[in-house]
């Protein structure tokens, strides 16, 4: 494997997948604290950057403690993509630029962006070459899906093209655009991509446990993994994966109190950033639904989360939930992990504190 990216040297990096509306600065920092090695911003429209849209620029904000961090751009105009990449480098100096060739969302695909370029390899190649040349020597990476649909799976060919354009590493999501997020990720194709190029390939898709990560690492030649939906409900999954990679033992989820502390921290910081608490917390409802998946009495919590509009309400729900059998939110003791010495060992292995 050849790479100019130092985080691959003698390591198996864990990426946090870029997810629109999810991987903002606050959530990225939470995941970093729990062991994510490499972060990527929410995808940013190259046209928005090119036209110096101030809202677009807000998506680029990050702290030095998040490094290594890449800014992900999407678009289909090579000249505009190149200029946008140059502007991003001038504005925020990321560690790399990432190109989105995998987004399945209709409004992106309709403009020939995201996964639409898997059907238009000449434009995909032109975009990649233009951006690589525009920001050299800064590394440029890319993310793709395995193809447009089941009849046009071309990930290996696309990977070869991107490698030839100077792309430094490639993340591959194991579904087609037509699948969206349904069905199963095809790790056979991801493995073929990893075999077919010399740049690092990062596997992505259906990685919901440490055991699954180790299985995919063993079965393929991937150089790292990218965690998406699993992190939305359990940002501590990065710590669990690292512990399992080092020790071969499973690390339980954090205590219930720690999980609630993460949720409340996220809500408080989000409200502070927005300035309007009620709007901020309403915008967090979908995120709270995701967090509830790893909490006892998830259904009852989701019903409560649908109506919250202040941090105080969330704190009250947390207090009730942790206290025991009140208001129908009785924690199921069989699903709560007891205090475990392995958590202390994990912090030693990973050299970080989840409460830092």
Question: Where in the sequence are the language-model features?
Answer:
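Alpha/beta catalytic cores of nucleotide-metabolism and tRNA/nucleoside-modifying enzymes
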Residues: 1-15, 20, 25-26, 139, ...
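Alpha/beta enzyme core
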Residues: 82-113, 117, 121-199
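Conserved beta-strand positions in the central sheet of alpha/beta enzyme cores
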Residues: 39-40, 70-72, 98, 141, ...
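Glycine-rich, positively charged N-terminal anion/phosphate-binding segment
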Residues: 1-10, 19-95
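Short, solvent-exposed helix-helix connector turns and helix-capping sites enriched
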Residues: 52-53, 120-121, 234, 276
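Active-site beta-loop-alpha junctions enriched in small/polar residues
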Residues: 19-21, 44-46, 74-76, 102-104, ...
